[in-house]
Amino acid sequence: MKPLLDVLVILDALEKEGSFAAASAKLFKTPSALSYTIHRLESDLNIQLLDRSGHRARFTPSGQMLLEKGREVLHIARELEIRAVKLQQGWEHTLRLA
């Protein structure tokens, strides 16, 4: 599900940047677009990812877990993309003999 990767990128930026405004500037999207995307995932999964009761949104335990595991998924997705490009360009895997 591609939109899930988009949400993971948004959650990562939100945690790193500290606010919807800063995350939206980094991702070249509006704060309302980020908020809507996160809210839609919360509705789809029937969980709350962010506690919005204070001045700044904070990750709930579920949100923190999704952020941490999501970062692993993003890392693997980036690695997969890099490997696919290298393979297409003729790079081969290396074999190490000990």
Residue positions per predicted region:
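Alpha-helical linker/hinge and terminal dimerization helices associated
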Residues: V7, D44-L45, L66-Q88
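Short helix-boundary/capping micro-motifs
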Residues: D12-F28
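Residue cluster at the C-terminal edge of the helix-turn-helix DNA-binding motif
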Residues: E17, K26, R40-Q48
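Short helix-coil-helix linker/hinge
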Residues: M1-D6, G90
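Interdomain hinge and pocket-entrance segments immediately C-terminal to HTH DNA-binding domains
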Residues: V85-A98
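A short LG(V/I)-centered, amphipathic sequence patch enriched
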Residues: E42-P61
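Helix-turn-helix DNA-binding elements, focusing on the entry/boundary residues of the two helices
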Residues: S19-F20, I38, R52
